[in-house]
């Protein structure tokens, strides 16, 4: 592992754990509750000591210049709600070197397993990990088993989530974001499937934040490395308090 890569990984995942806040949702669909004033919400999560913020390149350019925050991860996959049958087809919209030049220290790519366009998304993630390798940037793989062609093996208690983590690992990602599997036993299988840090996604907002925190406790006990949660944080009345509470579980428990 290169010196640049290892130092950037340690910055984003101190002691191998992280509270990452993705705010890439506004490209897919807008209005998005909590993302109307990006300056305000980004200031809140920075002040609460989030370990990373995941955004698209345009937001990073503006916010890096404004804040000097050195832990942006550039999400390079995009689609919108207007794409019809291709609305879940994430296309690559930036390179690792461009992300670096805009102020990011890591990059993120998404694959939706089982989508009719899965092969193209796998190709794009492979290109991204190769680019990132050249410039010493860590890669977050957001891999979700959610498409209509998804095949789940009868003995897979994770519902394809372990395979999603394995896809990210084998394609060269350094961190993977996956959905919660519903219980600690199955999530432990996900974490055991790969030697890279596994971050739990938040999913659609719903329920209480206390319920979200309880899931995070289960995930950490099962071997998780932290969270990559967006709507539960930026859509809340007080994002600062949400990040602080997540840090207490991920870093201090």
What are these regions (language model features)?
Residues 1-13:
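N-terminal basic/disordered segments at the start of proteins
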Residues 15-67, 71-198, 206-229, 236, ...:
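Alpha/beta enzyme core
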